[in-house]
């Protein structure tokens, strides 16, 4: 068997085996929170997400991780390591993906830093370039521990092709919900800027944004599971 094909099959097997958790993902061209986990704070956060600006594009996904698989970092520990999201040399390979053509792991986020004092997260995306995000983290310790991370764009991207995305009108939202038997990892990206209404272009954007949402989730999952 060709060596590259063999490596690809092994990589995909490991990737799919690990991420065999229940996952749902949706794309919408309006505000859409149908996958938001049912928590005591759901209404609060949906109201916040809906009320900041007119949402014209929204990608959301939810993973349910069985508690017995959670052998890595705790949710609280992960929230202190957001600087590890960018770079293959970071914990759990940062936000990265397996290239289906070569079987190699490649970085979506090439660099990252997080200033806990200012709450600013910087990530260098492989295509978009540098993104600066204002991060706020809410922690709720009750029977079901819940952690909400909001990261809103604090300036327009430098990349010409995404300059239509406005300051404070695009964000990443993560919700981690710990129950007795599972951990929900909910991820959402939304923006007031929608892709051009050409089917081929929309498919490209949906693939690009959906891939990043999925791999952000996968990074949190690897951290939780210690992979």
Feature names for model-found ranges:
Residues 160-165, 192-211:
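A short acidic/glycine-rich loop-to-helix N-cap element
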Residues 4-14:
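Sec-dependent N-terminal signal peptides
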Residues 127-129, 141-143, 153-157, 176-180, ...:
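Beta-strand elements of well-folded, non-transmembrane domains
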Residues 20-129:
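Hydrophobic ligand-binding cavity/cleft-lining segments
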Residues 86-89, 217-227:
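Sec/Tat-exported extracytoplasmic proteins
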Residues 134-174:
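Hydrophobic-ligand binding "helix-grip"
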Residues 214:
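Nucleotide-cofactor and metal-assisted catalytic machinery
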Residues 166-192:
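Compact beta-sheet-dominated globular domain cores
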């Amino acid at each position: 068997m060709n060596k590259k094909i063999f490596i690809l099959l092994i990589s995909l097997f490991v990737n799919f085996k690990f991420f065999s958790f229940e996952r749902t993902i949706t794309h919408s061209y309006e505000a859409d929170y149908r996958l938001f986990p049912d928590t005591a704070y759901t209404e609060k956060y949906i109201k916040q997400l809906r009320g900041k600006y007119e949402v014209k594009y929204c990608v959301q996904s939810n993973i349910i991780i069985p508690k017995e698989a959670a052998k890595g970092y705790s949710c609280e520990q992960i929230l202190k390591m957001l600087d590890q999201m960018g770079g293959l040399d970071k914990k759990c390979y940062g936000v990265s993906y397996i290239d289906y053509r070569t079987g190699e792991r490649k970085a979506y986020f090439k660099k990252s830093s997080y200033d806990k004092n200012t709450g600013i997260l910087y990530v260098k995306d492989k295509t978009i370039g540098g993104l600066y995000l204002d991060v706020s983290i809410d922690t709720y310790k009750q029977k079901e521990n819940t952690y909400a991370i909001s990261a809103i764009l604090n300036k327009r991207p430098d990349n010409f092709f995404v300059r239509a995305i406005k300051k404070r009108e695009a964000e990443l939202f993560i919700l981690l919900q710990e129950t007795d038997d599972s951990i929900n990892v909910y991820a959402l990206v939304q923006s007031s800027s929608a892709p051009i209404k050409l089917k081929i272009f929309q498919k490209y954007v949906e693939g690009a944004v959906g891939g990043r949402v999925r791999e952000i989730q996968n990074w949190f999952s690897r951290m939780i599971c210690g992979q």
